[in-house]
């Protein structure tokens, strides 16, 4: 069910979004060769608690940790483990939090240390730019298929691919709400966005095939050909004349 948020609800989501943005900035500053993934998870959980929020990932459908850390060919939903980041790793972090039961969700990808392959940098840049291009067009009346087509066309112009099985989504009192927003589509098709909706746009991009597979842990999603991946996401309010990003972080 699609929900329209009132001003009180929007304010709570803005608080969650700002705490999340600051928590992700903390993680960006920590990502260096030699850092343990468990330390990143612990630092984020402590940060959001200190700032009046709760985790919305931990125990969600049985997920055991507070953030998702996906490395290199891992696209999404990587479980933080006793693993040390290496120089040149492509690291994606997807995280969320709740303030008084209202959710926010965001993700970023960066290279740990120095990129070993220039194409990895291009992949990351293209994925973030695809998100920015989609956000620039958000306003009441735009249709979900148009959003997906913007992302797909930009990504595929660089000969990268967008997986078909994982999408953006609405968000509010639940982490995942209607509408679901694929990273591909046909312009002028699908549900129209309305003022007061809050959605998550999240381009997930693979350097090779669009196909994916799930690891034995039943959570971690890989590119089927083990090509490098990237993922960016923001929680976004649809306003009267456009949109407002609730999880914007400083570069």
Curated annotation (Swiss-Prot):
SUPFAM superfamilies: Creatinase/aminopeptidase (SSF55920). A divalent metal cation 1 binds at residues 94, 105, 233. Its EC number is 3.4.11.18. InterPro entries: Creatinase/aminopeptidase-like, Pept_M24, Pept_M24_MAP, Pept_M24A_MAP1. It catalyses: Release of N-terminal amino acids, preferentially methionine, from peptides and arylamides. GO terms for molecular function: initiator methionyl aminopeptidase activity; metal ion binding; metalloaminopeptidase activity. It holds the Pfam family Peptidase_M24. Substrate binds at residues 77, 176. Keywords: Aminopeptidase, Hydrolase, Metal-binding, Protease. The keyword Hydrolase applies. Binds 2 divalent metal cations per subunit. Has a high-affinity and a low affinity metal-binding site. The true nature of the physiological cofactor is under debate. The enzyme is active with cobalt, zinc, manganese or divalent iron ions. Most likely, methionine aminopeptidases function as mononuclear Fe(2+)-metalloproteases under physiological conditions, and the catalytically relevant metal-binding site has been assigned to the histidine-containing high-affinity site. One of its GO terms (biological process) is proteolysis. One of its GO terms (cellular component) is cytosol. Its cofactor is Co(2+); Zn(2+); Mn(2+); Fe(2+). The keyword Lipoprotein does not apply. Belongs to the peptidase M24A family. Methionine aminopeptidase type 1 subfamily. Monomer. This is Methionine aminopeptidase. The gene is map.
């Amino acid at each position: 069910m699609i929900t329209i948020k009132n001003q009180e609800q929007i304010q709570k989501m803005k608080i969650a979004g700002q705490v999340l943005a600051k928590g992700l900035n903390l993680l960006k500053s920590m990502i260096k060769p030699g850092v343990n993934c468990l330390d990143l998870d612990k630092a984020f959980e402590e940060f959001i608690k200190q700032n009046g929020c709760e985790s919305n990932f931990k125990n969600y459908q049985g997920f055991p940790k507070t953030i998702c850390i996906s490395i290199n060919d891992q696209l999404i939903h990587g479980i933080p483990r006793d693993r040390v980041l290496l120089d040149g790793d492509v690291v994606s972090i997807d995280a969320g939090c709740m303030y008084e039961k209202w959710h926010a969700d965001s993700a970023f990808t960066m290279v740990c240390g120095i990129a070993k392959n220039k194409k990895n940098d291009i992949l990351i840049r293209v994925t973030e730019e695809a998100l920015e291009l989609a956000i620039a067009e958000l306003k009441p009346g735009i249709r979900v298929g148009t959003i997906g087509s913007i992302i797909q066309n930009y990504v595929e112009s660089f000969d990268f691919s967008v997986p078909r099985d994982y999408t953006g989504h609405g968000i509010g009192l639940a982490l995942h709400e209607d509408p679901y927003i694929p990273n591909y589509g046909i312009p002028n098709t699908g549900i129209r966005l309305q003022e007061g909706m809050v959605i998550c746009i999240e381009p997930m991009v693979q350097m090779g095939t669009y196909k994916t597979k799930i690891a034995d842990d039943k959570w971690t999603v890989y590119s089927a050909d083990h090509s490098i991946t990237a993922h960016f996401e923001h929680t976004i309010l649809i306003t009267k004349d456009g949109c407002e990003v609730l999880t914007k972080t400083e570069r």
